[in-house]
């Protein structure tokens, strides 16, 4: 038995085997060590060969590869796919930001004074140009924005929230829990399906700091229901001398096609309606990097900047550089550089051209049909819009697994597996054809 164990390959020799030439060496060594230790602990008999060991290491390494971040082809049709990284960034915008991200910069350095500067100054200026707000601030995500705003203005004070807006977002993060941890005191008003202006008005007292309106971006209440508009809330808070805050979740610029803008708040219009402070995610409909964008009155933003917690939530030069390029693309009307918006605006005929190109060049049996999809990212949950799908013959679950194995993430609809071209980029088409034909040759 010991003789058999002595024949096991040496750890330091494994990376040199031809089977492992392109493997990530540190992980390979760690995984190989675990595999060899397991073989020894199980007292494998003398029949184990070097090839058996290599196969065991390969299988174990495959598990590591599954968790390693890698590019995927999103063929689900959901453009802002939370599990697939939300909004993709344009390669052109990344190129424009690369030099700044890889150099020293005046991130917090005043070129005119030679002293410490404001890291948010340039981004704030761009956001003021884009939205017409008084001032702006950036933190690392919208949950951080909610926390910072509540902690700054409502610590140990009451915040009025409609029961119909006490939402839970992804990963079990709930508005009531965020409020509790921020130091704010939640005061629920109205009912789940109906909240009236009088509910807010009758609940304001000397300990009320603000009214928080939470946009129902990842669910909707239909039927016998009503809510109070932010315009009416703004008038009430101004009259009663308290703040109003709109947690928008996902903000967009201008308009959206396919009637997606209907009943979906537009950031610029909200600013004009008299909202004191707004926050939303940078990597949802805005189509940029993960961050929390806060817009509001100058004195309120200044108070947020003076909160010591901001240092824990601040963003780095990488985030600011990419965000700046995104905002400039909007200001220059280079909307084709905002990848999610570009995909949303594609016509059915454009998507059909892509689908036909794939169908005409693959060996698997499939058909093109019109379908419907959703924007995703916790936005517009009840608003589907048209798309084009390539539907494949055969067992849907087996097809889904096979495509996923090769990095193409599709979806199943009515017991058929399909690739939805609403979320497929033009430069993915050739790769999709190559992958599908490779699968069919197996």
UniProtKB/Swiss-Prot annotation:
InterPro entries: PyrdxlP-dep_Trfase (IPR015424), PyrdxlP-dep_Trfase_major (IPR015421), SelA-like (IPR018319), SelA_trans (IPR004534)
Family: Belongs to the SelA family.
Stored HAMAP family: SelA
GO MF annotation terms: L-seryl-tRNA(Sec) selenium transferase activity
EC supergroup of this enzyme: transferase
Pathway where it operates: Aminoacyl-tRNA biosynthesis; selenocysteinyl-tRNA(Sec) biosynthesis; selenocysteinyl-tRNA(Sec) from L-seryl-tRNA(Sec) (bacterial route): step 1/1
Protein name: L-seryl-tRNA(Sec) selenium transferase
GO BP annotation list: conversion of seryl-tRNAsec to selenocys-tRNAsec; selenocysteine incorporation
SUPFAM superfamilies the record matches: PLP-dependent transferases (SSF53383)
Positions of modified residues (N6-(pyridoxal phosphate)lysine): 284
Organism name: Campylobacter fetus subsp. fetus (strain 82-40)
Entry's localization field: Cytoplasm
């Amino acid at each position: 038995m010991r003789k058999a164990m002595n024949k096991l390959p040496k750890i330091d020799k494994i990376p040199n085997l031809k089977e492992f030439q392109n493997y990530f060496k540190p992980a390979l060594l760690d995984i190989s060590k675990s595999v060899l230790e397991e073989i020894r602990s199980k007292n494998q008999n003398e029949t184990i060969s070097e090839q058996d060991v290599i196969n065991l290491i390969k299988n174990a390494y495959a598990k590591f590869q599954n968790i390693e971040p890698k590019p995927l082809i999103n063929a689900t049709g959901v453009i802002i796919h939370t599990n697939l990284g939300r909004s993709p960034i344009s390669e052109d915008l990344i190129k424009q930001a690369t030099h700044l991200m890889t150099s020293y910069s005046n991130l917090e350095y005043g070129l005119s004074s030679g002293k410490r500067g404001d890291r948010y100054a340039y981004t704030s200026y761009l956001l003021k140009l884009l939205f017409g707000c008084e001032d702006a601030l950036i933190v690392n995500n919208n949950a951080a924005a909610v926390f910072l705003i509540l902690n700054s203005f409502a610590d140990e004070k009451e915040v009025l929230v409609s029961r119909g807006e006490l939402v839970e977002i992804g990963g079990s993060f709930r508005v009531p829990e965020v409020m509790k941890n921020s130091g704010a005191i939640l005061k629920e008003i109205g009912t789940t399906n109906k909240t009236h202006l009088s509910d807010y008005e009758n609940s304001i007292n000397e300990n009320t700091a603000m009214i928080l309106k939470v946009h129902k971006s990842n669910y909707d209440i239909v039927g016998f229901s009503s809510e109070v508009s932010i315009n009416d809330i703004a008038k009430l808070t101004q009259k009663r001398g308290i703040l109003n805050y709109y947690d928008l979740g996902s903000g967009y610029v201008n308009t959206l096609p396919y009637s997606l803008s209907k009943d979906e708040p537009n950031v610029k219009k909200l600013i004009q309606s008299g909202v004191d402070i707004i926050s939303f995610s940078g990597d949802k409909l805005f189509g940029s990097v993960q961050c929390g964008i806060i817009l509001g009155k100058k004195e309120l933003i200044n108070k947020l900047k003076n909160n010591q917690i901001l240092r824990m939530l601040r963003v780095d030069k990488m985030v600011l550089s990419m965000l700046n390029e995104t905002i400039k693309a909007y200001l220059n009307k280079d909307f084709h550089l905002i990848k999610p918006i570009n995909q949303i605006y594609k016509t059915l005929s454009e998507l059909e051209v892509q689908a036909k190109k794939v169908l005409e060049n693959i060996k698997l049996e499939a058909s093109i049909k019109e379908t419907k999809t959703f924007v995703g990212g916790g936005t517009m949950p009840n608003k589907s819009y048209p798309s084009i799908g390539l539907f494949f013959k055969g067992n849907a679950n087996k097809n889904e697994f096979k495509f996923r194995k090769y990095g193409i993430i599709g979806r199943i609809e009515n017991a058929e597996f399909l690739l939805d071209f609403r979320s497929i980029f033009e430069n993915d088409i050739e790769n999709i054809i190559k992958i599908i034909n490779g699968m069919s040759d197996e």
